[in-house]
Amino acid sequence: MPAAGQAVTRSLRVNDLAFAFHEWRAKPGNHEPPIVIAHATGFHGRCYSAIAEAFPDRRVIALDLRGHGRSEGRPIDHWRTLFEDVSAILDQLRIRRAVGVGHSMGAHTLVQVASENPEVFSRLVLFDPVILAPEFYEDSGALYTSDAPHPTIRRKRDFDSPEAMMERFATRDPYSLFTPRVFEDYCRHGLREKPDGGFELACAPEMEASVYGASRTNSGIHDAARKVKVPTLIVRAQQGKSMDFKTSPTWPKLASIMPAGEDLSRPDRTHFHPFEDPEDAARIIAEFAAR
C-alpha cells in the first residue's frame, strides 16, 4: 500500500472499457472531501501530479478520460460520452461532496456531471472550461470530419523513448510554456510501450482529433451550467480571438449564469495555466476549497 503523498494507478471498468485513475491517499485521520481532477484534451491525469502533491494530507484522484493516458477508448462523436464515463467512474468510486478541479475539456465535463449529479461535488474550480458563447453551439454538427479532420490527426505518434519525445517537443508551443516537471510528467506518462518495441502516444491522434471535432455537440451545456448550484470558480486566461489555446476560448459571461458562479480573470496566464504555473493553480484551488 503506497504511503500518503505517493500516487498509485488503479483501474475500473465502465461502459465496457477499462478506465485508469491516479490516487494520492489522504494522511491518516484526514477526513476532508477528496479532490477530483479531470484533464484537458490530449493530456492525462499525471500531468497534474505537481498540483496533487500540493495537498499531501488530502486524498486526490486524477482521472484518465476515455482514450487518454492509461484508459481504453475509441474516438467519440459527442461530448456527452465523456460525461457518461466520468459520472459512472465517480459513482463506482462513491465520490460525494468532492472538490472538482477541471481543465479545458475536463472542466466542461465536470459542469455536466455537477448539473446531473448534484451530490458528487461541493465546489468546482474550473480552469478555462471551454464552454463557448451560446452561438458557437447553434450548429451542433461535427466541427471537423473524417474528410476534413482536425490538424492533430497528423501528430507524430511513435517515439523511441520518453526522452526522444521530450527532445522533440521541448521548444515547441505549447509545451515550452510548461514547467520542467509538468513537461516531463506529460511525456513520461503520455506514452505506451509498443509490443514490437518503442513507444506510441497514449492518446492516439484519432482520439484527440475526435474530441475537437465533436466540440460543439454539447449544445445543452449552458442549461447544465445554470443548474450547478455549488460554488464554482471559473478561472479564465487572457482573452483573444485566436484558437491556438494561448488565449481563453471560454465565454466571459459563463460565471454570471451559474447560481454560485465566480469569475477569476487571469490575463497573465494562457489556457495552460495549470501546466505553466501549477503552484499558482494549487493555491487557487486551496483558497477556494477553504472558503
Labelled PLM ranges:
Residues A20-E72:
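Conserved HGGG/HGGXW glycine-rich cap/lid loop of the alpha/beta-hydrolase fold
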Residues D64-H68, V130, R269-T270:
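Short beta-to-alpha linker loops that shape the active-site pocket of alpha/beta-hydrolase fold enzymes
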Residues R96-D139:
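Conserved hydrolase catalytic core segment
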Residues R157-S242:
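Alpha/beta-hydrolase
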Residues N15-L17, R25, S49, I61, ...:
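Active-site loop/oxyanion-hole signature of alpha/beta-hydrolase fold enzymes
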